């Protein structure tokens, strides 16, 4: 396409110059032998057309940067040792490891001790300990093993004897007085309950019916201080 454009531009240049119809060689007319004519002016035009050439633009040089190479080798070292005792009963092992790089540093240490407990067992030393005194110490007071009770106070207590009287309604006045009841000597300070007996009223039907007083009954009971009495 570029070559056609160059040819078209050259043809256009020829047309503008007016040289397309000009003869390639200049002609001379021979004059008569007698007459002399001045030499006509000869105009010579030379056109040197260089061969067309196509100029190609140089390709664009694209430079790619080489990748950044980081040369950072890591250096590692490890060490291990095992020390055993006579017979191999006990072993002590050491292990260490070191890794060094451009960005980090690591250290590791490991120590292990093993013992198979195969040593000779010594006889136990006979140690005589005195037998502990069998003494039972109790913080609480031991109960006294004895029967303890407040014995009734044998003392004469003048308690009022219960009034035992027979009462009849509008009957012939017959008063029966009972003898004093035996005084019960106890350790109870309260008065003995008064027990009063009342005879049933005498219903007199006729005068022929005789009247006899009811028997005097006295009941006494006491309960307290672990004792109970009744009669």
Swiss-Prot record:
Superkingdom assignment: Eukaryota
Keyword Signal: yes
InterPro entries: Cuticle_C1 (IPR022727)
Residue windows of the Sequence repeats: 130-133, 199-202
Keywords: Cuticle, Repeat, Signal
GO MF term list: structural constituent of cuticle
Signal peptide residues on this chain, from the entry's feature table: 1-17
One Pfam family this sequence matches: Cuticle_3
Domain notes: The tetrapeptide (A-A-P-[AV]) repeats found throughout the protein are also present in many proteins constituting the protective envelope of other species.
Known function: Component of the cuticle of Tenebrio molitor.
Listed name of the protein: Cuticle protein LPCP-23
């Amino acid at each position: 396409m570029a070559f056609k454009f160059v040819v078209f531009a050259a043809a256009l240049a020829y047309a503008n110059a007016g040289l397309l119809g000009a003869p390639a060689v200049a002609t001379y007319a021979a004059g008569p032998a007698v007459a002399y004519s001045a030499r006509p002016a000869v105009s010579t035009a030379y056109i040197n057309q260089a061969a067309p050439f196509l100029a190609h633009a140089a390709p664009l040089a694209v430079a790619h940067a080489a990748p950044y190479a980081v040369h950072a080798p890591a250096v590692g070292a490890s060490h291990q040792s095992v020390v055993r005792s006579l017979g191999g009963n006990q072993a002590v092992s050491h292990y260490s490891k070191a890794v060094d790089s451009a960005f980090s540093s690591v250290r590791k240490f490991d120590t292990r001790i093993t013992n198979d407990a195969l040593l000779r067992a010594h006889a136990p030393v006979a140690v005589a300990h005195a037998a502990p005194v069998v003494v039972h110490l109790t913080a609480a007071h031991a109960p006294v093993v004895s029967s303890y009770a407040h014995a009734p106070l044998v003392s004469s207590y003048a308690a009022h004897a219960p009034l035992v009287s027979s009462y009849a309604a509008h009957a012939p006045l017959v008063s029966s007085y009972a003898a004093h009841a035996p005084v019960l000597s106890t350790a109870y300070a309260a008065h003995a309950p008064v027990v009063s007996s009342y005879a049933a009223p005498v219903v007199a039907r006729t005068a022929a019916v005789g009247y006899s007083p009811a028997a005097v009954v006295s009941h006494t009971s006491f309960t307290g201080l672990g004792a109970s009495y009744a009669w």
